[in-house]
Amino acid sequence: MSNGIVIIGSGFAARQLVKNIRKQDATIPLTLIAADSMDEYNKPDLSHVISQGQRADDLTRQTAGEFAEQFNLHLFPQTWVTDIDAEARVVKSQNNQWQYDKLVLATGASAFVPPVPGRELMLTLNSQQEYRACETQLRDARRVLIVGGGLIGSELAMDFCRAGKAVTLIDNAASILASLMPPEVSSRLQHRLTEMGVHLLLKSQLQGLEKTDSGILATLDRQRSIEVDAVIAATGLRPETALARRAGLTINRGVCVDSYLQTSNADIYALGDCAEINGQVLPFLQPIQLSAMVLAKNLLGNNTPLKLPAMLVKIKTPELPLHLAGETQRQDLRWQINTERQGMVARGVDDADQLRAFVVSEDRMKEAFGLLKTLPM
């Protein structure tokens, strides 16, 4: 018997897809298989759990059972998919197998842990499950080292600092958020973190970790070291592509899909953090929401290409929040920065004075939507 549409994964992308399919078709068989509990939680909340004193279980919004009942689903939680036989259209686990008409990979991305000696001492906060495994250690830690000064690293540094912990943030780059924007734009947040007491070790490298009687000794370059109680890796995500590779699909950084979210196999699609859409990996909520709307139509036979507009990315650092959009990482833009007490507006323009990117902060974030309309599609 066919299971209709089979989805591997249960995160934000999978749930958005289920909701969009059920808006259009209440009865088509939907089967979800995932390695976790399949309980729903809001992943961005993980950046604020420590300052808000939340336990992992506090994050649960809907149990797997409630989800299955609400949307008429067949759920297989705590189930590891071991293989996909694309020719036979069968998904396999150790004890089970599922025939599919259409298969969707929504396997997400895993936290990258730098390959240094003692890397097993590093914690990651990429899921409710990961937080559950280390919440006691993080709650009890007085001194925390965050490895990586990107979006998640900056959010976590502020959160741990707000919780009264001694926070050190280390990054190879000369400024925070270096892969997202130039230093003259990120400097406002960088100064705020420093004012709050975050110890920034920029242009610095972690070389190894070692357990000691009183904590963890982190060895750095230039013969430096620091002792802490917990180390968190915030060095980016890697799309989960192992299953797709075993199915013989085309892989680059993520699972390669076209504008219809279709992989190199006509009956297999990919969505969310694991997908590379026409060469782009977009691990943000808005592109996932739009992709799920389009994919639901395509799975139900209404072929619709994905057209992504200019979209906002939000950096959730409550003491100095930022919104950004456009090609903020472009090296050839000229930045026009207007800073006032209530916030900043930074406009990145090209040689023709065309707005290509912007970053806004604090009370001036309300200007984001007007700027968004002037960005080229």
UniProtKB/Swiss-Prot annotation:
GO terms for cellular component: cytoplasm. Pathway: Nitrogen metabolism; nitric oxide reduction. Its cofactor is FAD. Transmembrane segments: none annotated. It is found in: Cytoplasm. Keywords: Cytoplasm, FAD, Flavoprotein, NAD, Oxidoreductase. It comes from the Bacteria. Its EC number is 1.18.1.-. It catalyses: 2 reduced [nitric oxide reductase rubredoxin domain] + NAD(+) + H(+) = 2 oxidized [nitric oxide reductase rubredoxin domain] + NADH. Pfam families: Pyr_redox_2, Rbx_binding. InterPro entries: FAD-bd_OxRdtase, FAD/NAD-bd_sf, FAD/NAD-binding_dom, NO_rdtase_NorW, Rbx-bd. One of its GO terms (molecular function) is oxidoreductase activity, acting on iron-sulfur proteins as donors, NAD or NADP as acceptor. One of at least two accessory proteins for anaerobic nitric oxide (NO) reductase. Reduces the rubredoxin moiety of NO reductase. Belongs to the FAD-dependent oxidoreductase family. This is Nitric oxide reductase FlRd-NAD(+) reductase.
